[in-house]
């Protein structure tokens, strides 16, 4: 229920059946988005559950694609990168790419208030209780199987309000 209307419309335009899930239920609940996706895939002939949270191809795509591309576009002049984290594929892949090609790049997590990742990065403790947030696609209530946070130096908890205001400012000033 946090997916933008535009993404839903685009998926439907390409012929996809979109099943909206609840964001107020935890892992293990029958309506939890990952559990529901796995169940739909297992009950649908010919279906495949991509499982972005456990699929090693997710971080590999960023380790060998996104990371080198960022370094090329920046002519290797990169001091730090600030990112959000959902499945952790981008973060894990970038971390691996930069460890090899630009080990001095600092990785910084911008995490929604309510996600367990800020506390995990900053304090090393893993909370079993998460809050709720409205920002789409980032923040977690568990550590994804593919995650590797060892190179992330610091995390900042960002409110939904600040996130949405910053997104609007970037759109107005930078066109992104």
Where are these regions (language model features)?
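Active-site-proximal loop->helix
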Residues: 1-40, 113, 117-126, 130, ...
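Short, flexible, glycine/charge-rich loop motifs used to bind or transfer phosphoryl groups or to couple energy/partner
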Residues: 7, 70-73, 97-98, 143-146
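Conserved hydrophobic/aromatic pocket- or pore-lining residues that grip, position, or stack substrates
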Residues: 11, 70, 107
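Surface-exposed amphipathic alpha-helices with a cationic face
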Residues: 12, 95-102
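Generic beta-sheet signal
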Residues: 21, 52, 108-110
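Active-site/ligand-binding loops adjacent to catalytic centers
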Residues: 34, 46, 99-176
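Active-site/ligand-binding-proximal alpha/beta "capping" segment
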Residues: 44-85, 94, 149, 153, ...
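Hydrophobic/small residue at the entry helix of a nucleotide-binding pocket
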Residues: 90
């Amino acid at each position: 229920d946090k997916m933008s209307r535009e993404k839903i419309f685009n998926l439907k335009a390409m012929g996809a059946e979109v099943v909206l899930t609840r964001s107020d239920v935890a892992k293990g609940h029958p309506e939890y988005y990952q559990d529901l996706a796995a169940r739909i895939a297992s009950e649908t002939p010919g279906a495949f559950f991509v499982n972005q949270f456990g699929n090693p191809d997710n971080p590999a795509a960023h380790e060998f694609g996104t990371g080198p591309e960022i370094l090329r576009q920046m002519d290797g002049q990169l001091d730090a990168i600030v990112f959000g984290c959902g499945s952790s594929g981008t973060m894990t892949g970038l971390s691996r790419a930069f460890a090899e090609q630009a080990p001095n790049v600092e990785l910084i997590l911008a995490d929604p208030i309510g996600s367990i990742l800020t506390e995990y990065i900053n304090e090393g403790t893993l909370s079993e209780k998460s809050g709720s947030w409205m920002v789409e696609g980032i923040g977690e209530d568990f550590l994804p199987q593919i995650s590797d946070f060892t190179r992330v130096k610091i995390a900042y908890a960002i409110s939904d309000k600040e996130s949405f205001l910053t997104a609007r400012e970037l759109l107005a000033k930078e066109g992104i």
